[in-house]
Structures are given as structure tokens and as C-alpha cells.
């Protein structure tokens, strides 16, 4: 915090003095008057679009956020940034650009704030990469900032059955194997997404919204209400008020996003059994906040934080059920009471985590959606970092979805997702599907493999086939699936030298992933290896390849 904070630490550059007559004239044309020049200017950045249901609520929420800014004595100015729909981009060339969009969002928001000299930020997002992109921008800018999630959709209904987007991907695999009819696939397609909002389960969007709340960058309780729920409008207004109050107190994003706050976010992700993408994104956000966070910190925290949430893709419930029993604060209170959270971390309310939880008095875990710490689903957290001869720099597995922690099988190697998808009807129990050249550089963009993993599970092979990739998985992925293998294939990591018939061993309990080929043979293969030519030689993807680093460090651009 800073003594006697200036409410207009940056916007005076465009409002004060004779030299700024032209700037003031432009601002008058968008509605500002003489009475507004002394008000802090708050940028309201939104990833609203009509491309995907994930973002549809943001237009409404941005209006409410602006009302809150006005009510608190600030002046809001709204602008939009891009967003990519992972659900629509899955399984084809478009997915190369999903992770790239995270960097574009962070860069574009930073660019507008730096150019227009806004004093504070309300950041609204609904999709998997727009959430971390916004938080990365907040960390870079280090202004007073509040993040608000668009909210999730409600589960669809097919007869008496609740369905979601993962059911659609799995139905495709079942259809390819003759286990599900084309008519059943069509019925799921028409019913799984009934209203606006992000995917309903504890997939990447809901995981990152929960992480943002635990990090202290969102208002308590704001992650879980569904997108159509009008409580979100109240959270939006309160977010607008909160950012002005942060300015008054001189609290900026990096005052909130400390190492201890990131440890809180990791703890909540572990307790929820959240998406493997949280590893990638939290590492990237921490880097922008100048926080020293490493991939092995996830195991350190996961060792002591139990898995508590029985949520999809591996469990029975969705985010609206989490909301029904009290939301993310229920998990945070349980962890705080057990000494597993840092209660003294500052948040966007201007209060600490412990003070927030005392104010709202969340209920105890209900025992079904959220288990008590004394009766966890798993004794340790829902994610694990693996190392071994196949992943010297690390890999990630969602242990929350594993019925067994050990698998050894025979490699079936595919250079790219499409070849693996074509082979799904031919897979057999005991196969280890290796999909390579899908890393941050090699893909580029670390494509998510939900089309393949969903097809494998839908084909009835989810417990009998291991999938290993230097790409990523959707938050909707569950089962024997290992991602973020590093070093990636295009950098000459061991995954580049795997051949059909090699034996691969996963031991999630020991946290190892090994290629059972002797060192001399691997050395011969390495000597004969040449990386493939780049997929893109122009445009944003070509630029991204030149800048992006390893998944083990968050796939950040340097």
C-alpha cells in the first residue's frame, strides 16, 4: 500500500493541462464533462463476443460494472478484446491458436491501458484462455484491478440424465466404435448447452475462475453463480465499486498476487480436482507478477491438500451444484480452518482472505458435492507433476480422475492429433497413444486433445489406454492422460525418439513417467533425428514460435 494514494496516477496524462486540450476534446465526444476530469478513469476490458456462449453474459455484466464504477466516483471506459472458443476450435487447425490467444489477450489489454492511461481495471472474461490472459495483463500493469468471470452454463438434460460438452465428445468416440447411434449423438448435440455460459463442469474456465477467487483477484463468492443468474450483475456492480476503493487505498494487483496468494490458488485447484491447464496458466500469471513459482510447487502443495470436490469430468456434479452448496468460499474456509491456506493474503475487497471468510461465514462442506477434510475423495490433491526418462522437465496428470495409479503398455506413436484420431477405432487395451509435435513450439500452440481423449473414453477404452502428449488436454479430460511432456518433441525431448512398440510406464503414485528403452538405443535415435519444418512461417503463429518457452515454465513468451 502507498501513503496518500493518487486516485489518478495515470489519467492525468490525458486530462490535465493546456497541452491536453485535444485529448479532452476527444473524451468530451464519448461523454465526459468538466465534472469528470478529476475522476479516476477505469478501463472495463471485456472479452464479450457472439462466437461462443461462454462470453454472452459479459455485455450485460460490463454495463453493471460501469454502474458500480460511477457509483463509487470513477469514470468507466469500456473496450473489448478477443476470445477464442476452445469447444468450437477443438479437434482441427483452429486449436493451434487457442493458447496463442492467451498472449494476444494479455498483450492487447496491456496495450490499451498503457496507451489510454487508465488508472484501474475491471477485467471480464468467460473462456479458458481469456481468464488467464486478463490476469496476466493485470499482473503486468500492476494497477488497481478486479477480475470477474462470466459464469458457467447449466447442465443440459437428455431424459433424466444431466449432460455437458464432454458427453458430446465421448459420444463421437462411441459412435466410431459402433457403441452409440448417430441419433444419440444428435440428441446430445442439441441439448448439452441450454443457456449462455462456460462449460458446466470443473473444466478449465471454472477452474481458473475458482483460482482467481482464491488468488484474491475476484470478489468472494463470484466464481460459482451460473451466467444467467442475476447475482452476477450484483457482483459486477460490486467489482466496479471495488476497483475505485482499491485506488483510494493504493492497493495494486501485485500487492494481492503474492507468492502466498498463488499457493492459495494452487491449494483450491488441488481441492477441486481442477484442470491440468491451471498449472500452465498459474505459472504464466506468476511470471507476469514477478513471483517465483515453479512446477514442483504443485506437488509440494498437492501433497498436503486433499481432493474434496466430486465434480465433473470425473465426478457427479457441476459448477451450479458447487454454487448451490456455497461456492468456492466453502472450500476456502475448510482449507483455512485446517491451516492449508494463507489467511493473511490481501484481496480485492481490501481485506484479507480470513477477514472475507469471517464476513460471509460460508457453510461447512455438504459432504456430497464438497467432502469434508476428514472424508476426502483422495488424500492428496487432484493434480500431479510427473518426471522421468520420458519427461525430464516434467509432465502433468489429473490424478483426480484415475481409478488406478499405474499403467505400463506399448507405444502407438502419432505425429499430430489428426493421425491419432483416425486410429481410435484400431486401439486396443494396453496401448500407449503418444501424440507428439503438439507442444508450444511444435504444434504450435499446444493443442488440447479433448476430441481424442473423449473418443477414447467413449469407445470404452478410458481405463485401458494411456495417452501421452507434449500438447495439452481440455479441462474436460479424465482418465489415463498425461500432458505437457517437457522437453517437447520439436526441442529434441525424449518424446521425439519414441517408436512404435516401445514400452512406457506411468506410476502416478511415484510421480514418474518413463520410456523403457536403454540409453544407447536412445542415443542412436537422437543421432538420426531432425526436427520437422515449422507449420507456419508467417503470421501470429510464426511469431509465437520464436517467443514461446517450455510448458514446464507456463509456455510464456519472452
From Swiss-Prot:
Gene3D superfamilies: IlvD/EDD C-terminal domain-like. The active site is at residue 474. SUPFAM superfamilies: IlvD/EDD N-terminal domain-like, LeuD/IlvD-like. Pfam families: ILV_EDD_C, ILVD_EDD_N. Binds 1 [2Fe-2S] cluster per subunit. This cluster acts as a Lewis acid cofactor. It comes from the Bacteria. Pathway: Amino-acid biosynthesis; L-isoleucine biosynthesis; L-isoleucine from 2-oxobutanoate: step 3/4; Amino-acid biosynthesis; L-valine biosynthesis; L-valine from pyruvate: step 3/4. Functions in the biosynthesis of branched-chain amino acids. Catalyzes the dehydration of (2R,3R)-2,3-dihydroxy-3-methylpentanoate (2,3-dihydroxy-3-methylvalerate) into 2-oxo-3-methylpentanoate (2-oxo-3-methylvalerate) and of (2R)-2,3-dihydroxy-3-methylbutanoate (2,3-dihydroxyisovalerate) into 2-oxo-3-methylbutanoate (2-oxoisovalerate), the penultimate precursor to L-isoleucine and L-valine, respectively. Homodimer. Belongs to the IlvD/Edd family. This is Dihydroxy-acid dehydratase. It comes from Acidothermus cellulolyticus (strain ATCC 43068 / DSM 8971 / 11B). The lineage of its organism: Bacteria, Bacillati, Actinomycetota, Actinomycetes, Acidothermales.
